[in-house]
Curated annotation (Swiss-Prot):
It is a multi-pass membrane protein. Its cofactor is heme b. The chain crosses the membrane at residues 33-53, 77-98, 113-133, 178-198, 226-246, 288-308, 320-340, 347-367. This is Cytochrome b. GO terms for cellular component: mitochondrial inner membrane; respiratory chain complex III. Pfam families: Cytochrom_B_C (PF00032), Cytochrome_B (PF00033). The lineage of its organism: Eukaryota, Metazoa, Chordata, Craniata, Vertebrata.
C-alpha cells in the first residue's frame, strides 16, 4: 500500500496533498476551517442535488415545490433545513477562515489569498441566487433590489439589468436562470478550491508564530487528519442542532409568504451573512457610490498584501495592530446589526460611521500601526 500511494498517478497527488504533506507542527485549531469549508461544500452539493430532484424552477410552482419537499418527500424537511442552515455554517467558517488569514498574515501568500477572494465572491453569488429559489416574498424582493443595483452602472446599466432578468421584471426567466447558476456555481467553487490548495501547497502553510517552520514539520496524516475530523464532528453537531431544533432561526418570516410583486415587505433585507455589505451599501445616499462601496467591501481584502509594510509576519507579536484588528471585528458585527435595522435615525448614522471605520482601518490605521511597530523594533 505504501508503494502504491507513492507511485500510482492519482493516489500520488492525494498522498502529496493529504498524507505525506509536510505541515508546521504548531498550527492551531484556527487552521481547521479550510477543511470545514470543504466539508460544508460537500454537504451543500449533496443536499442541493437531492433538492434539485424535486424542485421546479417555475414562478407558479416554485414555492409549492419547496412546500412539497418539506411535506411529502422522505426526509425532505431535513435535507432542506440542512441545506439552508448549511449555507449559514459555510459563511461562519468562511468569515473565520478569512479572519484567521488577516490575523496571522496569510495574505503574504498572495496567489492563495487572491484565489480565496475569488472563492469568497463566487460563494456570495451562489448564496444570493440560491436565496431567490424558494420564491417567497423576501426571495422575490431581494432579487429585485439587488439585481436593480446594476442599473447604477453608467450607460449599460439598464440594458444589463434587463439582460439578467430576461425581461422587464424579475419573472419566470429570472428564476430559471438563477436555478441554472445555483446548480453550476458550486462545481466552479470546487474547481477554484482545488486551485486554492494547489497554490497553498506550492508555498506551504503559514503558522501561528509567523516564523519559518521548515525545520519543524510533521506529516499531515495522522496528526492533522484526526484534528480535522474532530472539527468536522463539531461542525456536524452544530449543524444538526440548528437543523433539528432551530431550523428557521436564521431565515426571514417574510419568506413563508409566496412572492407577490404587488406587495412590498416593510423591510427588505438579505440573509444575515450579507448584512455587513448591505449596511455599507445603504450608508451611501448615492446609488452608484453605494454599489461601488458594496463591491469594494469585499475587494478591499486584495489590498492587504499591497498595504503590508510590517517587518513581522502576523499579529501575534504586534499588540497595537491586535487592538485595531479586534476593533475591526467589532465594527463588522455592528455593520451586520445595522444591515438588519430599518433605514431611520439613529441606525443610518451608526451605519455611516461603521462604514467609514471599516475602510479606514484597512487603508489607514493598519499601515500606520505597522510603521509604529517597525520603529519600536528599532529602539
Amino acid at each position: 500500500m505504501k508503494i502504491l500511494r507513492k507511485n500510482h498517478p492519482l493516489l500520488k497527488i492525494v498522498n502529496h496533498s493529504f498524507i505525506d504533506l509536510p505541515t508546521p507542527s504548531n498550527i492551531s485549531s484556527w487552521w481547521n476551517f479550510g477543511s470545514l469549508l470543504g466539508m460544508c461544500l460537500m454537504i451543500q452539493i449533496l443536499t442541493g442535488l437531492f433538492l434539485a430532484m424535486h424542485y421546479t424552477s417555475d414562478t407558479t410552482t416554485a414555492f409549492s415545490s419547496v412546500a412539497h419537499i418539506c411535506r411529502d418527500v422522505n426526509y425532505g424537511w431535513l435535507i432542506r433545513y440542512l441545506h439552508a442552515n448549511g449555507a449559514s455554517m459555510f459563511f461562519i467558517c468562511l468569515f473565520i477562515h478569512v479572519g484567521r488569514g488577516i490575523y496571522y498574515g496569510s495574505y503574504v501568500l498572495s496567489e492563495t489569498w487572491n484565489i480565496g477572494i475569488i472563492l469568497f465572491l463566487t460563494t456570495m453569488a451562489t448564496a444570493f441566487v440560491g436565496y431567490v429559489l424558494p420564491w417567497g416574498q423576501m426571495s422575490f424582493w431581494g432579487a429585485t433590489v439587488i439585481t436593480n443595483l446594476l442599473s447604477a452602472i453608467p450607460y449599460i446599466g439598464n440594458t444589463l439589468v434587463e439582460w439578467i432578468w430576461g425581461g422587464f421584471s424579475v419573472d419566470k426567466a429570472t428564476l430559471t436562470r438563477f436555478f441554472a447558476f445555483h446548480f453550476i456555481l458550486p462545481f466552479i467553487i470546487t474547481a477554484f478550491a482545488l486551485v486554492h490548495l494547489l497554490f497553498l501547497h506550492e508555498t506551504g502553510s503559514n503558522n501561528p508564530s509567523g516564523l519559518n517552520s521548515d525545520s519543524d514539520k510533521i506529516p499531515f496524516h495522522p496528526y492533522y487528519t484526526t484534528k480535522d475530523l474532530l472539527g468536522i464532528f463539531l461542525l456536524l453537531l452544530v449543524l444538526m442542532i440548528l437543523a433539528l431544533f432551530f431550523p428557521d432561526i436564521l431565515g426571514d418570516p417574510d419568506n413563508f409568504t409566496p412572492a407577490n410583486p404587488l406587495n412590498t415587505p416593510a423591510h427588505i433585507k438579505p440573509e444575515w451573512y450579507f448584512l455587513f455589505a448591505y449596511a455599507i451599501l445603504r450608508s451611501i445616499p448615492n446609488k452608484l457610490g453605494g454599489v461601488l462601496a458594496l463591491v469594494l467591501s469585499i475587494l478591499i481584502l486584495a489590498a492587504f498584501p499591497l498595504l503590508n509594510n510590517s517587518k513581522q509576519h502576523g499579529l501575534i507579536f504586534r499588540p497595537i495592530t491586535q487592538v485595531i484588528y479586534w476593533i475591526f471585528i467589532a465594527n463588522l458585527l455592528v455593520l451586520t446589526w445595522i444591515g438588519g435595522q430599518p433605514v431611520e435615525y439613529p441606525f443610518t448614522m451608526i451605519g455611516q460611521i461603521a462604514s467609514i471605520t471599516y475602510f479606514a482601518i484597512i487603508i489607514i490605521l493598519i499601515p500606520i500601526s505597522n510603521t509604529i511597530e517597525n520603529n519600536i523594533i528599532k529602539l
